[in-house]
Amino acid sequence: VAGNSGPTSGQEITWEEITEHAKSPEPIVEITTATKRKRRVFTFGEKDFRKAININRPTKLMLSFVDYLKYDDRHKTSWDSLTQETKDWITTLESKMNVFFNFLSTGPNPEHTIIRKTNGELAVKAQIGQ
């Protein structure tokens, strides 16, 4: 989002804060396609997430931008290879929201996807497009 997109339960933060929190050696930033401005970014909005879950009743969930939590998780392809801090954050969120993330995105490409079984164990490495 580059402009005002309405209310959100997340708190607006800066790309610099994300870069610092993730301990990234390089700046993390997203630019909008049309205006070429920095995309607005927010903390995870638990209230919005819960509302979306209640309205949509999804059967599978994907959590994107896991690599924005910790740069060390960038391009990981297995649950076991994620940092303990990231795994703890995800499992705490899952428990709190009573959900399970079947897919975790750790980078910009399809192969940077972790597919999990419902018991939280790694199912298979994503083989998208093969």
Which residues fall in each region the model found?
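Non-transmembrane, aqueous-exposed alpha-helical and coiled segments at domain scale
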Residues: 1-130
